[in-house]
Regions:
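Catalytic cores and adjacent flexible loops of soluble metabolic enzymes
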Residues: 1-237
């Protein structure tokens, strides 16, 4: 099982918070911490509700390199969703192991093709994919598709696990509150769980209230290990 603690913007632009999130994620047993690398003016209009907060959480190249180094020092994998070619170049320079294509980028053909050309493994959220089946991504690396509902937060009734084949969807990008949905997805065969992670749900920002806190991350990791034991497999890593 692969557990991804999605830091996203939950560092609020504060590198010390970002580093603490990395350390705590490692202590609680996550396999990967993931960030979002973007130019806010390319993805959000100035009147977007959370524009100011997204701008403050926008990481520079130097900050990305520092955080990737911090991940290496504590022994957890650094990964990211990159939203443009400039930031793809940053992550290639630091030798990032695998990429995440976010739901909002699923139709950005040039970006996807450039990511695919790296030959690295790719995880793809399908929350905004409108076609039947799966998008075609030509790459030498492995492609894992994640079931996702692009609604924040996702309500339990928005999920459709009975019609999700987790032998084809490798995992679940979970935007529900709590960890119940992730546990059900794992029991149904998901091998990858990605979920937003925060130090404190009461912190200010768009994603904190719907994120898992350190205790929930620890529970998710422990239960995932038990589910692996019960199902008799240890995959994804």
């Amino acid at each position: 099982m692969l557990i991804i603690a999605e830091i996203g913007q939950n560092h609020n632009g504060d590198l010390e918070i970002a580093k603490k999130l990395i350390r705590v994620a490692r202590e609680k047993g996550a396999d990967i911490v993931k960030f979002q690398l973007y130019d806010v003016d390319r993805i959000f209009p100035p009147d977007f509700q959370w524009y100011k907060e997204a701008k403050e959480a926008q990481l520079t190249k130097e900050q990305v390199l520092e955080l990737a180094g911090d991940c290496e020092n504590v022994g957890i994998e650094f990964s990211a969703s990159v939203f443009d070619l400039e930031r793809l170049q940053w992550t290639e320079e630091l030798g990032m192991k695998r990429y995440k294509i976010a739901s909002r980028s699923i139709y950005e053909e040039e970006l996807i093709n450039k990511i695919a050309a790296t030959g690295k493994d790719i995880m793809v959220s399908l929350g905004m994919y409108k076609e039947d089946g799966f998008p075609e991504i030509n790459t030498k690396g492995k492609v894992d598709f994640l079931y996702c509902v692009a609604k924040y937060p996702t309500m339990p009734e928005d999920l459709d696990f009975l019609n999700v084949d987790f032998s084809r969807h490798a995992g679940f990008s979970d935007h529900t509150i709590g960890i119940t949905a992730s546990l059900i997805a794992m029991a149904r065969g998901a091998r990858i769980i990605e979920k937003h992670f925060t130090l404190d749900k009461q912190m200010y920002g768009p994603d904190h209230s719907g994120s898992m806190n350190p205790n929930e991350l620890g529970q998710l990791v422990r239960y995932s290990q038990q589910i692996e034991d019960i199902l008799g497999h240890n995959t994804a890593k």
